[in-house]
From Swiss-Prot:
Compartments, as annotated in UniProt: Secreted, Cell wall; Secreted, Extracellular space, Apoplast; Cell membrane
Post-translational modification: Contains at least one intrachain disulfide bond essential for its enzymatic activity.
Gene: XTH17
CC per GO annotation: apoplast; plant-type cell wall; plasma membrane
Name used for this protein in its record: Probable xyloglucan endotransglucosylase/hydrolase protein 17
Name of the top EC class for this enzyme: transferase
Tissue expr: Root specific. Expressed in all cell types in the elongating and differentiating region of the root.
Disulfide bonds: 226-235, 267-281
Entries under InterPro entries matching the protein: Beta-glucanase/XTH, Beta_glucanase, ConA-like_dom_sf, GH16, GH16_AS, XET_C, XTH
EC number(s) per entry: 2.4.1.207
Signal keyword on record: yes
Record's keyword terms, sorted: Apoplast, Cell membrane, Cell wall, Cell wall biogenesis/degradation, Disulfide bond, Glycoprotein, Glycosidase, Hydrolase, Membrane, Secreted, Signal, Transferase
Pfam families: Glyco_hydro_16, XET_C
Catalytic activity, as annotated: breaks a beta-(1->4) bond in the backbone of a xyloglucan and transfers the xyloglucanyl segment on to O-4 of the non-reducing terminal glucose residue of an acceptor, which can be a xyloglucan or an oligosaccharide of xyloglucan
Amino acid sequence: MKLSCGTSFAFLLLFLLAAQSVHVYAGSFHKDVQIHWGDGRGKIHDRDGKLLSLSLDKSSGSGFQSNQEFLYGKAEVQMKLVPGNSAGTVTTFYLKSPGTTWDEIDFEFLGNISGHPYTLHTNVYTKGTGDKEQQFHLWFDPTVNFHTYCITWNPQRIIFTVDGIPIREFKNPEAIGVPFPTRQPMRLYASLWEAEHWATRGGLEKTDWSKAPFTAFYRNYNVDGCVWANGKSSCSANSPWFTQKLDSNGQTRMKGVQSKYMIYNYCTDKRRFPRGVPAECT
């Protein structure tokens, strides 16, 4: 299946020196993921494994994880979020490594009361430290139809796209002493859970459990990545994807989205960083 993370930058051409370690997954939830928590609240709805739902009630949320770990790659999924009053709920699609000094790349969708927009929260963690938040209000209602969300992760940068449009690029800042996720393989995760103490207006809006169960849908899960196997994942430095970046059109589109729809950027939060914004922001 053709991946559709975006037309504004070249597709990643991922391969390993050991050919058996290269995998392109065409999106079967039956084969490629396991619903690892939720006690039946996560369900695969079709024989081909293309459609999966996660539900949340007052007792528990639910989630799934990929069967494979990846060290670099491109992952996408189509999502349709919880409709109506979703205050206090968090729906996610993200990459994460295990352990106490984990790496993580986040798409998190923070619910809201009826008639108010979701907040799309993005973040990057390295060695257990994040604090690199950018947040957006989407230019569409993400509860009406499915929309495509994609993470592209390579040694130079991480690119977040929505329906093929880049909304964020986080470049590798190791040259200035800022960590970047380059060494820890990550699994893909998705979840629906309750965080009413902070998710909606800083916790002012609480979850209305009379509306439960809350349900989000995922379909057309795709991964093109370097699979971590036998303790290593050796990708060829001669591959063009090592130097891929947004072209001028991609940069223009991203800046347009950020100017219209970004509602928070840690790089401009001088109150939070009174002694100066983080080094990668300058």
